[in-house]
Amino acid sequence: MEKKEIKLQMKELIKLMSEGVWEKEDMFSLTLLSSIAGESIFLLGPPGTGKSMIARRLKEVFAEKKQFEYLMSRFSTPDEIFGPVSISKLKDEDTYERRTEGYLPWANVVFLDEIWKAGPSIQNALLTAINEKIYQNGNETIKLPMKALIAASNELPKEDEGLEALWDRFILRVVSNPIANERTFYKMLKGKNKSKVVIPTELLITDEQYTQILEEVEDIDIPDNILKDITFIRKKLKETESQDEATSPLDYYISDRRWKKAVHLLQTSAFLNGRKEIDLTDLPILYHVLWNKVETIEPVMKIVTESLFWNIENKCSVVEKEYEKGLKTKGNALANSKIANINSEDFNIYFYFYTKLMGTNWGDTYFFLQDYGYLLMDIETKGVLYFDKDKNGWIIRRVPQGPFSSKKYPQHQIVSLRRAQGGIIVNNALYMMEPSKKASKPIFPPTGQQNLFSEGDTHLIEEMQKIGNELNQKMRLLEKENLFVSSTDLKVIQKYADNLGKKCEALEMKIKTSI
């Protein structure tokens, strides 16, 4: 089977399944993924958000269309799910056997609404059906044709009701929300109702193709870098579990069986995207696999996103530690010169209150002159460096301290400030204030920046540039199309990468100010 062909087939199926349904393409794609992987999926959401429609449309992608749909209640019986007992068999042959045609054991697509209302006898039979794809019908063991089990509810299973085992069997867990975008909502109101879709015969998934896919998915490689990312996720989940006092030990627990099925899901994603191995673009699918409670969705998404960039963050951390070590070991020589009082007339004044710093390699930079008197020689003061559009330049100011200083600045804008003769020390690099023609005496030293680090230390900048390139390359990979990663999930990744990029840029700027 050609990898390119399978991807085009899946892409077209997702498009057709999603026709006339708004903001649900990710649910259709993940439901298709789970069915082809032979796994189950749980849809969480209020009534009227398209959960049952997804199951009905999924049925249409298979050549053999057999669907069973049922709304559970506390009074539901096994007869209603698995079929009524055959009276004739019981009477004539003394055999307890169900007539399964038209019921769950007969269907290849099953949709069970309000799943958690099922009684213990139904739950036990479902566990076997999900785990082993078999159903014990009297003396006969039936191999189930079920390709997809889709369950739905507007709530999660309640604790201490014995539902944990059944809940663990739903590998994919997707939240179904009402339409969020108002323009999309208007399109839905104006659009024609289209309850059924027509799938061209050549796109239908036959039993033969389905079996072939399952076999070929087993050969999809799991690279070492993906295994390391998974190890990172496992460690982080355990750390979060131990640190979050508001959660129970099971809130972040992922069983070995669940991990095995999760990786099988990633292998299926890789295959259906036309690849021979799992890559980074598959990992965001774990957003919808590793959470156990609504409260853990956000932490889990954060951990999975971190797993995409942990090696880059580690490299940044190593550079930062080396930089900080250099600051400590190379001393405070720049601040030890004798400090004299300054006269504002000795310096050129800009924008009424600012003087210009010389030698900055990131652009014109202005220092709020009144802050000079608050700076100390041997103790760092927190400052802020930011770009002012009105002044078309960078501004450095002291961050006021005290009970009334409530304004907070992003971490990448924070710098350390110290006082020096005729200038200020920013992140341990001296920048002289621009002297005026009226200066009463020469300002020492006469040049702009005095370097704390030598030119031999430029390897830190080179390392940061390599890290920046690696981050850009990783984002280019992550932005490649994956049929089962939504634009919403991709935005989460992009936002995280942007923040990481700013953090790296801030560190690089700190280093540059010291070289």
Predicted features by range, described:
Residues 3-7, 20-21, 159, 174-247, ...:
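Conserved C-terminal "switch" segment of AAA+ ATPases
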Residues 298-515:
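Terminal-proximal interaction/regulatory segments of ATP-powered molecular machines
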Residues 30-34, 87-110:
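Conserved alpha-helical scaffold flanking the Walker A/P-loop in AAA+ ATPase domains
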Residues 219-221, 236-311:
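C-terminal helical "lid" subdomain and adjoining coupling/linker elements of P-loop NTPases
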Residues 4-46:
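Pre-Walker A (pre-P-loop) alpha-helix and adjacent loop at the N terminus of AAA/AAA+ ATPase modules
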